[in-house]
């Protein structure tokens, strides 16, 4: 599967490392050339120095013919814009990391789709869900009571 990851920060770098171990065709795009050089030298992936929110950078990264485009920069609006550009270029599926619940609100789902975002990842929400699920297990509740 051809995967383009926009953003080589903590999340994007970690994701690229994990996916490169699974024999995926990974392209990582970011404007930080030093960070990309380190990742390119140490992992089975390709990199493009460019803005994740520019048509030029995303075209060069191959966003127009990728199976999966994942935008995980630290900035929610950049991720939405990157997904919108990638989708318009021809990306099959787009995923954006967000930092507010507003985009997850079911009332906004159709607007998010029209912007070119197929899936949303909200790390804080996922962490809260994991904690709630863990608390449903007896052994976890007992551990907290100690």
Where are these regions (language model features)?
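Cytosolic regulatory regions of ion transport systems
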Residues: 1-146
């Amino acid at each position: 599967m051809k995967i383009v990851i926009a953003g080589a920060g903590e999340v994007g770098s970690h994701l690229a490392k994990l996916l490169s171990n699974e024999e995926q065709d990974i392209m990582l795009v970011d404007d930080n050339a030093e960070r990309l050089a380190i990742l390119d030298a140490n992992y089975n992936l390709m990199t493009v120095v460019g803005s994740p929110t520019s048509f030029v950078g995303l075209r060069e990264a191959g966003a127009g013919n990728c199976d999966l485009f994942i935008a995980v920069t630290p900035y929610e609006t950049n991720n939405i814009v990157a997904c919108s550009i990638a989708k318009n270029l021809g990306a099959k599926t787009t995923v954006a990391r967000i930092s507010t619940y507003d985009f997850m609100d079911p009332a906004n789902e159709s607007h998010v789709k029209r912007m070119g975002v197929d899936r949303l990842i909200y790390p804080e929400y996922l962490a809260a869900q994991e904690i709630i699920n863990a608390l449903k297990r007896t052994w976890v509740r007992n551990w907290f009571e100690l």
